[in-house]
C-alpha cells in the first residue's frame, strides 16, 4: 500500500518529480523515459506516481507548464520595460520564446515529442498550449492597467496568440525558410496589437 503524503509532502514530491523528469527528458526524450526510472530516482514507490498523474503524457504536459512558468517568472521581473511599448514588449516575448522552442524542437527530441502531445486534437481545454500563458497575460494586463498604459486587454485573445504562434512554429517546415521568421513576427505583432487597446 502506498504511503499517504501530507499536502506539503505532495508538493515537494511533485516538484522533485518534475525536476527529475526534466533531467531525464533531456537525457533520453519522452519516449525512453520510464515511470519506474523516474520514481526510483525520486525515491517513491512506482504506484505513488499515479497519485500525481494519470499517465506519462499528463506528466509531460505538467513539465512543459512548469518550465514555461519558470521562464515567465523571469520575464515578470522585466514588466517595467513594457510600459513604453506594451505591444512591442509582448510581441518580443512571444517571438523570442517561440523561436527558442522551435530551435529546441529541431535539436532535442524531447521538445518535438512534447509538441506532438500538445498538438493532439483530443486535449482537454485546460491542457491546450495557450493555457500555460494565461496567468502571465493576466498579470501583465493588470500591470499595464495599474500604470495607465492601456485601456483594455483581451486576455483570451492574447492567449490565442500564443496558441497561434505554437501552431505556426510547429508547422514551420511548410514555409520557405527565408520567409518564415518575417511572416512569424508579422503574425505575432499584428495579432497582439488587435487585442491591446491603448
Listing of model-derived features with the role each one plays in the protein:
Residues 69-76, 120-147, 156-160, 182:
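Amphipathic alpha-helical packing segments from all-alpha helical-bundle domains
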Residues 89, 100-123, 171-174:
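Amphipathic alpha-helical segments used for helix-helix packing
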Residues 1-28, 36-37, 41:
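Basic, helix-initiating cap at the start of DNA-binding domains
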Residues 16, 20-28, 74-78, 161-172:
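Solvent-exposed, amphipathic alpha-helical segments
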Residues 24-58, 62:
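Helix-turn-helix
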Residues 11-19, 31-32, 52-76, 80, ...:
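An amphipathic alpha-helix adjacent to DNA-recognition modules
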Residues 145-189:
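Hydrophobic/aromatic-rich alpha-helical bundle segments in the mid-to-C-terminal region
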Residues 62, 76-103, 158-162:
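Hydrophobic alpha-helical connector segments
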Amino acid at each position: 500500500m502506498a504511503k499517504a503524503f501530507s499536502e506539503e509532502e505532495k508538493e515537494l514530491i511533485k516538484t522533485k518529480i518534475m525536476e527529475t523528469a526534466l533531467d531525464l527528458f533531456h537525457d533520453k526524450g519522452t519516449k525512453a523515459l520510464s515511470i519506474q526510472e523516474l520514481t526510483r530516482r525520486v525515491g517513491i514507490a512506482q504506484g505513488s506516481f499515479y497519485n500525481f498523474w494519470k499517465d506519462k503524457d499528463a506528466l509531460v504536459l505538467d513539465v512543459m507548464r512548469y518550465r514555461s512558468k519558470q521562464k515567465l517568472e523571469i520575464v515578470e521581473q522585466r514588466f517595467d520595460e513594457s510600459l513604453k511599448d506594451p505591444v512591442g514588449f509582448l510581441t518580443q516575448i512571444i517571438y523570442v520564446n517561440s523561436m527558442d522552442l522551435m530551435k529546441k524542437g529541431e535539436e532535442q527530441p524531447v521538445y518535438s515529442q512534447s509538441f506532438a502531445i500538445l498538438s493532439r486534437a483530443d486535449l482537454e481545454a485546460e491542457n491546450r498550449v495557450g493555457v500555460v500563458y494565461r496567468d502571465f497575460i493576466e498579470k501583465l494586463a493588470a500591470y499595464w492597467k495599474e500604470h495607465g498604459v492601456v485601456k483594455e486587454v483581451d486576455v483570451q485573445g492574447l492567449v490565442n496568440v500564443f496558441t497561434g504562434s505554437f501552431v505556426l512554429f510547429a508547422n514551420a517546415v511548410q514555409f520557405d525558410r527565408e520567409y518564415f521568421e518575417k511572416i512569424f513576427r508579422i503574425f505575432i505583432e499584428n495579432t497582439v496589437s488587435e487585442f491591446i487597446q491603448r
